[in-house]
């Protein structure tokens, strides 16, 4: 009999007997899918795929911590201990290389390696090196949300690409606030990475190198351009009085205030503001992520969740069959409708109900095609925290100093010469 595979702290004798029966030879294997917190959509998909499996397997879910960094820590620790109870994992893209490099992930079967019809940003974030090591589930990107009345008053043609300079000038001239993310958190790394990438640069040059050989390129013209945007917004208070602690939710609240104007944020804000019956909804519009240069397309952020299978699971074949079911386009479309998380499959965006519920759906899909991942390296955690520590508070960012000092600090951390 397989060893007990459950996360509940207390089990009754009856439940133990039931689980033992499930894992016995006569019953289907019970797959544990470790999920990030949502509004119940992953649990519903698990139930649907269990029913569709026809007795081949049963999927149960186990809830991971709310913060992505805590999810990473828990999964990495358990996989390092060769925990066989981890069958399927919902993985935040930046932490995938850290799981793949030491062999914690089961190889993706050939039949699931076909990425035709998947948005490019999700494909890029599912890779480690040249290999697809996870399967895209849902994908996320940031749009530029704005008040139509403000854009009109500022004389901005929002049918044309808009730049950060134009947004900053509009906020300065009309005494308005910009919804950005200045908190000492992952959201700050997301913002800086998008600015550097949109300027044509990259934070990390050689992501597959060992930690002591990694080369950063923050100390560059593109890094200084990114710092200039952050500095202008931070030093002039354009991000509002709460900018040092402003995460995505704070930016949304600021946007709904009297001096709200423009905001970069994930699509969750649309359903959140609609659910709150916000007065802003009548004046709300959206477009692609701001450009650094009017002639160069932006590189929007990409996030979401990819699915991996634990290398120590005794049920890897069944787990991959379950993954194939979970990521079906119709399930992704339903998940967008119930939980507000956009699909990675282009086909899902053709769903009529989805199109009606999310009028910006096509823009999200197109943005995901242009999106650039954060540095794909097993040492992402060190890079992200190091960047946050050196670019916060944003009011203190100096375009001539911060990129270089940040690069030096992170490099010393990676080489073991300095502690975070």
Locate predicted features.
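Conserved C-terminal helix/tail region of periplasmic/extracytoplasmic solute-binding proteins
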Residues: 152, 366-420
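Hinge/lid segment of periplasmic solute-binding proteins
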Residues: 93-141, 198, 285-286, 356-357
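Glycine-centered hinge/linker elements that transmit conformational signals in sensory
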Residues: 171-172, 211-244, 289
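Conserved N-terminal structural module of periplasmic/extracytoplasmic solute-binding proteins
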Residues: 2-4, 11, 15-95, 278, ...
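Extracytoplasmic/periplasmic solute-binding protein
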Residues: 133-137, 142, 165-219, 231, ...
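A structural signal for short loop-to-beta-strand junctions that line the ligand-binding cleft
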Residues: 76-78, 85-87, 115-149, 296-299, ...
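Long, aromatic- and glycine/proline-rich binding clefts that accommodate carbohydrate-like moieties
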Residues: 287-288, 336-386
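Extracytoplasmic/periplasmic substrate-recognition and gating elements
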Residues: 152, 232-238, 274-339
